[in-house]
Amino acid sequence: TKQITGAKSAVNVVYKCAQLTGNYNFEHHIDYSPDYIDTYVERLPFEYLDKKEFNVLYAGITNVPPIEDRKLFYGNFYEDTRNPDEVREVFRYGFSYVPWTNYDKKKIAQIYNEYNLLDTLFPVTRSCEWNEHVGGKDPGIEHCGNCWWCHERQWAFGRLK
């Protein structure tokens, strides 16, 4: 994860999922580096796999909203790099599972609603990727409300918390 707050949130989400399902039969690995770089994060799962430290990597990456909707978001980072209409592989490299990669956050919000998770799981999840370029005070484990990811969350769920 890029930020220590992401690692803290991941623990909260996994714990809440275990509580809600009654399933505690898993191992949860988190890797946090204050010197985060994309190449490190891309390489790390292969190192764990080589050491037989896990069998599968689950990632919660979602698709981006339609271009016309995300033009309203701060920064509009993905307009040139991600096409919301492109169908992406859900299972990659023989061990990486990205089940939500072809669904935008509005679809995820529908799933939360369908399974009555808006008042239980949603409050412990976090989308914020605040950094000094966004401005304002570091929100810690809360949401800044100003970054692209907070705008996406608000767009999909109609709220941040």
Predicted segments — roles?
Residues T1-K161:
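Nucleotide-activated chemistry modules centered on ATP-dependent adenylation/adenylyltransferase
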